[in-house]
């Protein structure tokens, strides 16, 4: 079963090739402009960004729905959540 086919992607962002802190800030900014429960498709580099960016997004209250290998990196599907609900 391919669960990605059931999820609607509302926005997409590619932060591969930039410093992980900058990538996280760009992802956070993108999510701030989205509505609750919308899904961000986020492309990140393997390695350290794969451990730090999802952790930081979860700490912000967002939900990582999918983490899978993609061309030259990793594809995440992130559901926007709010810590204050």
Question: Predicted regions: what is each one?
Answer:
Residues 15-67:
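Amphipathic, hydrophobic secondary-structure cores in small proteins
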């Amino acid at each position: 079963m391919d669960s990605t086919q059931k999820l609607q992607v509302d926005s997409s962002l590619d932060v591969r090739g930039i410093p992980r802190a900058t990538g996280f800030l760009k992802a956070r900014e993108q999510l701030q402009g989205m509505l609750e429960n919308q899904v961000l498709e986020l492309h990140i580099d393997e390695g350290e960004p794969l451990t730090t960016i999802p952790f930081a997004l979860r700490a912000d209250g967002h939900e990582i729905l999918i983490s899978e290998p993609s061309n030259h990196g990793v594809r995440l599907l992130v559901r926007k959540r709010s810590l204050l609900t």
